[in-house]
């Protein structure tokens, strides 16, 4: 396995790499990331995993400085998976100008759901992913469904800007108690970790009501927020949306997703659950 740090070297490798699948990450890899890697391996001759903590997608007061940088441990995990290349550029390599002068601006979705609470986050995501697509030139890119809004943003700009890459969504990896796997789970105290699976349980309760025929979307959202709040969560949102577009769900929609973001202590957790109605 190669660890490549420069764009020039990565592009030189790419010329003879055949069909390439790509998994972009910020490192600190866990089983959820490795599930993406394994899916990527099924679909291509070679897999590239990028490791880059992208400053542009962190807002003021967020955890950019304390986000774990664990390149050697990550490389060991990826070597064990048989990955061809780890692309680990530094900030100057990916952003040679002091300021990124041109950005990818996702319309609509940028200011909804998580975008309301993390201004500029999805601009940062879309910009860095588009840069990485230009550098790696993958045939396929795998993204986890845990970051459902991020996945929708990436699908949107790939379609609208004619990127020649197939986006492969991969189901959310979960711990045995249902908690979605996330690098930020390590910030949780022992007591918070015990409480954290409640977020997924509330999503399942909403989904069950929808499957049983409830059309009181606002009521279901409100009850989930109230339940989480009673147990000490600070809730950003619980919302039911159309799964394909993330537009507000309407009666008669068959493919839905319920999404949530909430803070437990100082740790912000997100999760979602897709629902197909009969």
Curated annotation (Swiss-Prot):
InterPro entries: Cyt_trans-like, Pantoate_ligase, Pantoate_ligase_C, Rossmann-like_a/b/a_fold. (R)-pantoate binds at residues 57, 150. Beta-alanine binds at residue 57. Its EC number is 6.3.2.1. It is found in: Cytoplasm. The reaction proceeds by a bi uni uni bi ping pong mechanism. PANTHER family: CYTIDYLATE KINASE/PANTOATE-BETA-ALANINE LIGASE (PTHR21299), PANTOATE--BETA-ALANINE LIGASE (PTHR21299:SF1). This is Pantothenate synthetase. It comes from Neisseria meningitidis serogroup B (strain ATCC BAA-335 / MC58). The lineage of its organism: Bacteria, Pseudomonadati, Pseudomonadota, Betaproteobacteria, Neisseriales.
């Amino acid at each position: 396995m190669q660890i490549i740090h420069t764009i020039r070297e990565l592009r030189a490798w790419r010329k003879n790499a055949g069909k390439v699948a790509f998994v972009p990450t910020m490192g600190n890899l866990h089983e959820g990331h490795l599930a993406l890697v394994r899916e990527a391996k099924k679909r291509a001759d070679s897999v590239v995993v990028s490791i880059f903590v992208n400053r542009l997608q962190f807002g003021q007061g967020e955890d950019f400085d304390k986000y774990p940088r664990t390149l050697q441990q990550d490389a060991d995990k990826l070597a064990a998976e048989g990955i061809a290349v780890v692309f680990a550029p530094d900030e100057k390599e990916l952003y040679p100008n002091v300021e990124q002068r041109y950005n990818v601006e996702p319309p609509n979705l940028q200011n909804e759901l998580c975008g309301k609470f993390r201004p500029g986050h999805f601009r940062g995501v879309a910009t860095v992913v588009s840069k990485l697509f230009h550098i790696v030139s993958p045939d396929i890119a795998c993204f986890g469904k845990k970051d459902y809004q991020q996945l929708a943003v990436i699908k949107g700009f790939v379609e609208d800007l004619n990127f020649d890459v197939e986006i492969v969504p991969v189901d959310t990896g979960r711990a045995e108690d249902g908690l979605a796997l996330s690098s930020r789970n390590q910030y949780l105290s022992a007591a918070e970790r015990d409480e954290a699976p409640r977020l997924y349980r509330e999503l399942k309760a909403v989904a069950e009501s929808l499957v049983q025929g409830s059309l009181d979307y606002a009521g279901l959202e409100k009850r989930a927020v109230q339940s989480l709040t009673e147990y000490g969560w600070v809730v950003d949102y619980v919302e039911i949306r159309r799964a394909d577009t993330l537009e507000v769900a309407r009666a008669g929609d068959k493919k839905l997703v319920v999404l949530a973001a909430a803070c437990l202590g100082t740790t912000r957790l997100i999760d979602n659950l897709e629902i197909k109605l009969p």
